[in-house]
Amino acid sequence: LRCLVGSEMCIRDRTITGVGHSSHDEVWTAPWGENKRHRNRYNEMSVSVRKPDKSMAFTLRFRAFDDGIAFRYELAQPDSLAVTDELTEFRFANEGHTMSWSIPGNFETYELQYREQPVARITDANTPFTFRTGDGIFGAVHEAALYDWPEMVLRRDSAGVLQADLAPLPDGVKAYIPGRFTTPWRTIQIADRAVGLINSSLVLNLNEPSKIEDPSWIVPQKDVGVWWGMHLGTQVWTMGPRHGATTRNAIRHIDFAAENGIQGVLFEGWNKGWENWGGNQQFDYLEPYADFDLERIAAYAREKGVQLWMHNETGGNILSTKPSWKQR
């Protein structure tokens, strides 16, 4: 467990100034989700560390749950910092006999095909990085409480070890943080069966509680949509013979949603501007393509009791949205 602040190793030449232990056990209720009640039970150890000249101090906090472990840094020093790397490593005892399921490490997308292969063959992976040991134990490497910090992917280093790799800023620095700062949790979930990973509340328990005092106005819903066909290559975003967001296709999806108790239909590629993808990224957020009759589709959806969810892409050009929003 290491990190770099500038060119300085966080834990090199440091002195442990204190070790604390505590336990916690509570049950909390979620307003919605797969499970209503979540048990948050863990044993905790905090290790306080300081440089001899007292210029850098931080705490390493570890938590052991019934179904996994987690750890993070809590920094406390007077000046802001430029974090250049995080060198947290994840080592597997027998990589050749430990199977994994993951997508390739990518800072821009999670819409990739999952791979099933031994850990020994992994060069990079997004998290959650799911694995099964040779003796049948399931696990997953992930993160929790990710605030004001880059996402983590796993990448094999020159020593052959899977190491945390953080998405960089344009200048190459990983994060600019205030002197008092808490990093995300690094998590490892453990289960006898794969379903135990899905049912685990470990990551939820480590995230901050919701700051929404009254969530009654938020209504979870299911949707079907015109978008995945583009990623599969069977449809395209732009108008033409293979256009996905057409009036005919919209009606078909609305009928399916109404017949199966699905509340909404999502449309991607319905508005003009997708032909600019990869160029100036200028989208029109009010004008549909000619083969997408928005008024007819909206009236039909209203008749069927189905909501329309319109995807408005920016392509990273967030400023292009402002003129359109002013027209609404």
Residue map of PLM features:
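Acidic, contiguous internal or C-terminal segments within carbohydrate-active enzymes
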Residues: 38-94
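Active-site-adjacent "subsite" loops/lids of carbohydrate-active enzymes
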Residues: 294-298, 303-328
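Single conserved hydrophobic/aromatic residue that forms the stacking wall/gate
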Residues: 1-6, 10-11
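Conserved structural scaffold segments of CAZyme catalytic domains across common CAZy folds
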Residues: 51, 64, 90-303
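An acidic-aromatic
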Residues: 5-7, 82, 88, 99-101
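Residues within well-ordered beta-strands of beta-sheet-rich folds
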Residues: 70-74, 188, 307
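Edge strands and adjacent loops of beta-rich recognition modules
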Residues: 27-41
